[in-house]
């Protein structure tokens, strides 16, 4: 059986609060595609894999993105350069960066923090998202 990695050897993460300004409503898969394409265009496959972007939560137009600590500047610059999605203008505004989801929700998104297991229970009752 494999042991879990101690905290000193784990990947250091940062959480980024995003606001996406787009004329149509975007779904989670669209936001993932936008972020990955922006990173791929700016820093290539290697930079995208080092950044390891992961969408934690998205409610149009706000979202929370997990990113590697070393690649935060790379993400900022790539998202600021991305200006088009489906041949329509898009603007991605980074509201703030923190090292905890709770802090992101309370300080930047002004949403009370909900324990993760409750979020998963709601999603199971609600069904899959598009």
From Swiss-Prot:
- Native species of this protein? Methanococcus maripaludis (strain C7 / ATCC BAA-1331)
What is this protein called in UniProt?
A: Ribonuclease P protein component 2
Reactions performed catalytically? Endonucleolytic cleavage of RNA, removing 5'-extranucleotides from tRNA precursor
Q: Does the keyword section mention Secreted?
A: no
Question: Quaternary arrangement and interactors, per the entry?
Answer: Consists of a catalytic RNA component and at least 4-5 protein subunits.
What function does this protein fulfil?
A: Part of ribonuclease P, a protein complex that generates mature tRNA molecules by cleaving their 5'-ends.
The family note in this entry says: Belongs to the eukaryotic/archaeal RNase P protein component 2 family.
Q: Which gene encodes it?
A: rnp2
Give the enzyme's EC designation: 3.1.26.5
Family annotation (Pfam families): RNase_P_Rpp14
Where do the coiled-coil regions begin and end?
Answer: none
Keyword terms of this UniProt record: Cytoplasm, Endonuclease, Hydrolase, Nuclease, tRNA processing
Q: List the InterPro entries.
A: Pop5/Rpp14/Rnp2-like, Rnp2-like_sf, Rnp2_archaea
GO: which molecular function terms? ribonuclease P activity
Compartments reported by the entry: Cytoplasm
The Gene Ontology CC terms held by the record are: cytoplasm; ribonuclease P complex
BP terms from Gene Ontology? tRNA 5'-leader removal
The answer on whether this UniProt entry bears the keyword Signal reads: no
User: What's the domain of life for this entry?
Assistant: Archaea
């Amino acid at each position: 059986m494999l042991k879990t990695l101690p905290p000193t050897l784990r990947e250091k993460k940062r959480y980024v609060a995003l606001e996406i300004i787009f004329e149509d409503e975007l779904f989670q898969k669209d936001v993932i595609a936008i972020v990955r394409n922006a990173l791929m265009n700016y820093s290539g496959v290697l930079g995208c894999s080092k950044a390891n972007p992961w969408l934690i939560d998205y409610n149009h137009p706000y979202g929370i993105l997990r990113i590697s600590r070393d690649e935060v500047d790379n993400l900022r610059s790539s998202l600021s350069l991305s200006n088009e999605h489906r041949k329509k203008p898009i603007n991605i505004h980074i509201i703030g960066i923190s090292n905890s989801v709770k802090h992101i929700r309370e300080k930047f998104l002004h949403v009370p923090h909900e324990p993760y297991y409750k979020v998963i229970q709601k999603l199971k009752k609600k069904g899959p998202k598009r």
